[in-house]
Amino acid sequence: DGYTPRL
């Protein structure tokens, strides 16, 4: 979605 932070 372009926002959901992923490490």
Swiss-Prot record:
Cell compartments where the protein resides: Secreted
An annotated GO BP: neuropeptide signaling pathway
Main location group: secreted
Residues bearing the modification Leucine amide: L7
Entry keyword annotation includes Secreted: yes
GO CC list: extracellular region
UniProt keyword terms in alphabetical order: Amidation, Neuropeptide, Secreted
UniProt function note: Myoactive.
UniProt protein name: Pyrokinin-1
Organismal lineage: Eukaryota, Metazoa, Ecdysozoa, Arthropoda, Hexapoda
